[in-house]
Every structure is written in C-alpha cells, then in structure tokens.
C-alpha cells in the first residue's frame, strides 16, 4: 500500500488534508494517536474534529486482535457515536484465538473490513477474508479445497482472495 502520513491537530488541519487527498485516494485512514477508548472527553473532541463535510462516508473502528471480549464491547459502545459499520483488526499475528472477537462483532453486527499482521501496520494491511480467518484459527482442521471452492482461491502468502 502506498500511503502518505500526515498529522492534523484540529478541524482546519483535517479539512485541508482531506481536501488534498480525497480526489486522488481510494482510502484515507485517520489514527486517534493512542488515546484511551475510555476517555469520553477525547472521544467528544474527536467527534468535533471529524466534522468535515463528506468525510464520514466510511468510518472504520480499529483495535488489536487480542482485545478481550468485555473490553471490545466497551470500545464498540464508546465509539458508536461515529456511526462506523466495519472495523480494522490490527496485530492479527499476535494471537491465534479469534473466537471472542468474531462473536462480539457478530452480536454487534459489525464486519471486519481490514486486518494487519505485524508491526509495520501500513505494510501488512490487507482486506479481511473469511479464508484468512479460517486458515489462522487455532486447532481448526482446514479443508483447503472446500474453502477455496466456496470462498475463492487465496494467495498463499497473504491469505487474500484474488
């Protein structure tokens, strides 16, 4: 992925950056710079900063794959004010237990759009696929032929479908 990284401190900065990139970009990712998901004051400020016309077309909530079920439910609830429909799951290489994550997201009707594997988030970001998760479940006996017939042929290196 060829990505530029910029920093916005306020709504004017964000508006300028959005206007710069919107016409020529498939995606614009915004990181909340590591604030606690329990910091309601910061979440309120973020809501104000993200108030840029046409910007909230697709908002993804991001969290680590190893996040526990109770914490994940809390994070999803606290950020619900942003109206996100899908999530980005990072650090998928740091766990082999995805059951709680998938269960909580299913209960909340949230889809996994993207995943990352490794410390180089931008370099390892890929579209999430059912095949990737099936291949990475602990103690799951995989029938690759059946999965590939149902979901498509996956790239052996990335797990992404062609």
Role assignments for model-derived ranges:
Residues 53-67, 71-75:
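Phosphate/Mg2+-binding loops and adjacent switch elements
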Residues 37-43, 71-73, 97-100:
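Conserved ATPase-coupling elements of RecA-like P-loop NTPase cores
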Residues 105-162:
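NTP-binding/hydrolysis catalytic cores, primarily Walker-type P-loop NTPases
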Residues 1-14, 18-45, 53, 64:
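Switch II (G3) loop of P-loop NTPases
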Residues 11-13, 34-37, 65-69, 92-96, ...:
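Conserved nucleotide-binding/hydrolysis micro-motifs of P-loop NTPases
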Residues 24-25, 47-48, 78-80, 105-107, ...:
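Short, hinge-like loop/turn segments at secondary-structure boundaries
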């Amino acid at each position: 992925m060829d990505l530029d990284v910029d920093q916005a401190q306020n709504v004017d900065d964000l508006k300028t950056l959005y206007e710069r990139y919107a016409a020529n970009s498939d995606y614009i990712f915004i990181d909340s710079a590591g604030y606690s998901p329990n910091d309601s004051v910061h979440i309120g400020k973020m809501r104000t900063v993200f108030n840029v016309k046409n910007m909230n077309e697709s908002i993804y909530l991001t969290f680590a794959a190893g996040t526990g079920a109770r914490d994940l439910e809390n994070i999803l609830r606290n950020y619900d004010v942003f109206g996100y429909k899908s999530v980005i799951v990072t650090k998928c290489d740091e766990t082999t237990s995805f059951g709680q994550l998938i269960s909580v997201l299913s209960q909340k009707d949230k889809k996994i759009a993207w995943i990352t594997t490794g410390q180089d988030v931008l370099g390892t970001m890929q579209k999430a696929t059912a095949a990737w998760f099936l291949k990475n479940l602990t103690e799951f006996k995989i029938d690759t032929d059946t999965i590939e017939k149902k979901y498509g042929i996956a790239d052996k290196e990335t797990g992404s479908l062609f």
